[in-house]
Amino acid sequence: MPKIDNGPPDYRNNLPPIVEQNYGKWEYHESPRPGVLKHVGPAGALYSVRCASPRLVCVDFIRDVCALADKYCGGYLRFTSRNNIEFLVSDEQNVEPLIEECEAQGLPVGGTGASISNVVHTQGWVHCHTPATDASGITKAVMDDLFEYFQRDDLPNKLRIAMACCLNMCGAAHVSDIALVGIHRTVPRMDHEAIRKGTEIPSLVACCPTAAIRPDPKNKSVTIVEERCMYCGNCYTMSPGMHIMDAKNDGVAILIGGKVSNARTAPSFSRMVIPFLPNNPPRWPEVTEAVRHIVDLWIANARRGERLGEWVERIGWERFFSLSGIPFTDKHIDDYIFSRETFRTSAAFKY
């Protein structure tokens, strides 16, 4: 077939030789140390050396990483879904020298097994057009505080943290153990002149998920039913005249208990535990302290093998709020039209 520039390349054309030879024949996998995975098959062993990356990187950084791959593993590496770098090493003698050089270049090795892996985050103030908070800044502050857990693998289970700078949540925050979500709290400020000059009114009305935006033919603009607005910012995507960002009222909510894994219990969505924390750059101390508090509570009380959400479900959400000291308010009650599906339907409570 002729080559076409459509979609990703066939992954089979880029596999390391050891992976091709062992494909479908792997015998077992083990973790010799935090940050290193060993995969064994009939044709030999492959070592995955995992180190963290800041996700938003420059060309020079990529060149340095590729130079390490050329030197120690024949140029074979990959980026994980959590923005870690994995060097695919087929020669065991190259593992330790690679780790030493990674550490020397400021690339910490870790994030495997029962640890806190790299934080998935969205664009934030760097690039997103509807952010309620920054993504890179909070990620840096939180992981600086939790860095010791990246290089250990003795936690109750793996812990996944995600950061989304707005409710669009392109950072998979809804299925992470701890999710940091930027939230807007005020309705968009309408610039009617900008709306009239540069907006398709039908598209703007149709984009609102709660039908809060209504056409205003008299003014050739729109109106907003404030009671229906959920502050998602989707309307700003359709019109530059719908200003959603508010430096005073925007902030961060914290959700916990989500997971994608189907092991032990079914996949689950995260649930909100802290409805609002202020934006205090550059280090976001309130957010960092809250995350550290939740992580320490989980480590101290969870059983071996329990994800954060599994631990909370075992002891009950009532007990979690009691242990954590986080106040339970009316903001925790889901008022979405279909939220009844998620409500507890029995009289069994856990205190």
Region locations from a protein language model:
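Short glycine-/aliphatic-rich beta-strand segments at the starts of folded cytosolic domains
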Residues: 9-16, 22-57, 120-124, 270-276
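Terminal amphipathic helices with adjacent charged low-complexity linkers/tails
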Residues: 89, 93-101, 313-332, 337
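A glycine-rich phosphate-binding loop feature that marks nucleotide/adenosyl-phosphate handling sites
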Residues: 119-122, 160-167, 308-321, 341-342
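Long, compositionally biased charged/polar accessory segments in the mid-to-C-terminal portions
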Residues: 284, 291, 297-306, 311, ...
